[in-house]
Amino acid sequence: MEQKFTTMAQEAVGDAIQSASAAGNAQVETLHVMDALLRQENGVARSLIEAAGGDPQAIGAAVRNALVALPSASGSSTSQPQASRQLTAAIAQAEKEMQQMGDEYVSTEHLLIGIAASKPNQSAEILEKNGVTAASLRKAVPGVRGGAKVTSPDAEGSYKALEKYSTDLTAAAKEGKLDPVIGRDQEIRRVIQILSRRTKNNPVLIGEPGVGKTAVVEGLAQRIVAGDVPTTLQGKKLISLDLGSMVAGSKYRGEFEERLKSVLNEIKNADGQIITFIDEIHTIVGAGAAEGSMDAGNMLKPMLARGELRLIGATTLDEYRENIEKDPALERRFQQVFVGEPSVEDTIAILRGLKQRYEAHHKVTIGDDALVAAATLSNRYISGRQLPDKAIDLVDEAAAHLRMELDSSPEEIDELQRKVTRLEMEEMQLKKAEDPASKERLGKLQAELADTREKLSGLKARWDAEQAGHNKVGDLRAKLDDLRVQADKYTREGNLAEASKILYGEIPSIQKELAAAESADAESADASAANPADEPMVPDRVDADSVAEIVSDWTGIPVGRLMQGENEKLLHMEDYLGKRVIGQKEAIAAVSDAVRRSRAGISDPNRPTGSFLFLGPTGVGKTELAKALADFLFDDEKAMVRIDMSEYMEKASVSRLIGAAPGYVGYEQGGQLTEAVRRRPYSVVLFDEVEKANPEIFDVLLQVLDDGRLTDGQGRTVDFKNTILIMTSNLGSQFLVNEDMDADAKKKAVMDAVHMNFKPEFLNRLDDIVMFHPLTREELGGIVDIQVAGVSQRLTDRRITLDVTDSAREWLANTGYDPAYGARPLRRLVQTEVGDQLARMLLAGKVHDGDTVLVDQTGGEHLELSAWASDQIVSDNPDVSVDNVTEDK
């Protein structure tokens, strides 16, 4: 018998046997089967009962109550319960129903009708009490099935397959659920033109992710609803097919094909009234294919060629090339419609069209300056994504951020709330104390607590009033949006009386109320501008600064308005860098000017912020200036992309910068330069010892220096427009340290060496070639302070103070001076004379936490260190006394 049952019918009977056995019932009754049918996920029984006029929940509750009342055997029984006489009769009736309906398998609806028709049984009585009879169930079957027949064991899965696996876009457009589509008229007209063809009427929308391919289809749905289409498309139904849900849960071989076939049959039987849309159309290639079975693409081909299926597809250029173009037989059935990225001006128009929807959703006001900022800033700073998607995301997130702030208590209220809690806890403790001091403190505390509570109460009242105003405006906008949708619906249906009632009665009333609420907000804003004390606790308007904050969060690029403090910092940038890098004013000025141009917004938007070649002998501060710049911009000198060019001496090492080509090891890993900049687009990039690299490296950098972009091994474009590129080199350093040459001769000799090593097209693209001069003996004194400060900083955890006398500083500067090697010999000298001696004293226990260490030079070959602990000096030099320390200090 089970051979004639569908899979779901077999599962229902199996579940009924299990539940009867678990409950200790001697027989399997119709109640058990009825309960199993109602509990089935994606089952037909509940839908059929609803269609027949019954309440599945009420019937299910009655069935469960009846099951509890069934007699159960005590003790455990190993025998399986048998079908009762009533259940046997119901199954026999179900088989008769199957034959009468012309089906090939007994399905769950046959079982349900069989139970209702084979009276007397308890399940039939429950159904009848709830207004469901065998006749009403039979009448409801065609509607639930969608006209399908039971011709396979998985038939229930194909009932109303189109409704189950698709979304009706025209219905969504009628209900106003789709966002308005601004522009894209040319693309929509082209789609309509292709759909109007007799054969091969299948447009496929191709474009980069985020340019608005799906929006074109939504725009078509809105035009169909509005009647703004040719007669060939008027009244048509546009549905979006979900291949993912069709594949999901298809456990058995052929189940996916069965579902797709059911959908295609429903579309075919609609006689051209249905237009199908498949987003990510490339997924049809290979979908459902396993062990030789056909994929969705091959099943669609015949209908696509004959024009029986009008299909709109959407996919990206890469996916179309990789999947659709590989199958010429499938590709020729589609007509391509290219959807390009809109311009910044078009994006602003799109954002203005969407503004009302986002204002109604977030219940905030979105200023026009925010829309312009979203389009322009996203176009300039967010690479790797397309307009208008990235601009819409910026506005959406900025509005969501503001809404979150509006729904949270302001910081002032939080602080006062915490203060009240703290004072209340202290009050409880003081009330228990009896001493006079505690009582006096209690009186003062209670006065402070009363004052704080009063302040908190006033702030809360003000906050509640502000929130009420914000919410009123938001609610009115949402209501206005709903009324417009209703008016459009009544107009389409021809119900002009209701439409005019909304258009000329309710909408003007809401608009008047909204205008009054908005003007009240505007007056409040003007008052707060005149008197900062009246400023709103949280603003309710998304402006350009709000959008700039989101851009900064996404990219790390500071694109917000320059604050007064930052203005001062940028104007005195040379002073800050000059504290770290001694004696190189020309280089510091060149870098500072580049940063100021960028932050003021007047640098060339298509080139890097700055590109410099630093020339000079070793140890004069070339690399240190790059570190200082990273520290100035990011408060962290490690926030710098450092490429040691000595590692790129071979020709093959070029691929390490931008990533290996396809087919080579390391292709998936990306390049060391491109990946670092892609993750941190606002950074200082240092190419250290650039003359040691293979000459072919510079051919790769030409595009970066000129256009601010570089394509990596995987074909992705990496944006370098917000980076500062610094290259350091020792070329010609022998001329710079030659004291017999004058300044002009030195410069000419160095530039000749540079021109011999680098190509003209590389040098011509640099913003500036900066020469670092050898350090003088006087400048080395400043570097002594920096090096000693570094040692002192490392001792702060142990609270050890380093006190260096003037004689020690002078000795370090004189001994460590070597114009050919710069500041590095001085660093080594400080390490050996101060660091090494201090380490020995620490290990010997001569220096303890909290001590002061005196560094002095009294004429010997080395510096002398003395530890000042309490009232005595612990020293390696017996000649140094407390008096000497006092005198030196």
Curated annotation (Swiss-Prot):
Compartment(s): Cytoplasm
List every stretch annotated Repeat 1. 5-70
Q: Where is this region: Repeat 2?
A: 83-147
Please give the residue ranges the record annotates as the region NBD1: 160-341
Q: What is its main location?
A: cytoplasm
Which stretches does the entry tag as region Linker?
342-556
Query: Which positions in this protein are listed as binding ATP 1?
Result: 207-214
Where are the residues of the annotated region NBD2? 566-774
Region (Disordered) location = 515-539
Query: A GO molecular-function term, please?
Result: ATP hydrolysis activity
The biological processes this protein is annotated with in GO are: cellular response to heat; protein refolding
Q: Where is this region: C-terminal?
A: 775-889
Query: Which residues take part in binding ATP 2?
Result: 616-623
Q: What is known of its domains?
A: The Clp repeat (R) domain probably functions as a substrate-discriminating domain, recruiting aggregated proteins to the ClpB hexamer and/or stabilizing bound proteins. The NBD2 domain is responsible for oligomerization, whereas the NBD1 domain stabilizes the hexamer probably in an ATP-dependent manner. The movement of the coiled-coil domain is essential for ClpB ability to rescue proteins from an aggregated state, probably by pulling apart large aggregated proteins, which are bound between the coiled-coils motifs of adjacent ClpB subunits in the functional hexamer.
Function, as annotated: Part of a stress-induced multi-chaperone system, it is involved in the recovery of the cell from heat-induced damage, in cooperation with DnaK, DnaJ and GrpE. Acts before DnaK, in the processing of protein aggregates. Protein binding stimulates the ATPase activity; ATP hydrolysis unfolds the denatured protein aggregates, which probably helps expose new hydrophobic binding sites on the surface of ClpB-bound aggregates, contributing to the solubilization and refolding of denatured protein aggregates by DnaK.
Q: What is this protein called?
A: Chaperone protein ClpB
Native source organism of the sequence: Bifidobacterium longum (strain NCC 2705)
Gene responsible for this protein: clpB
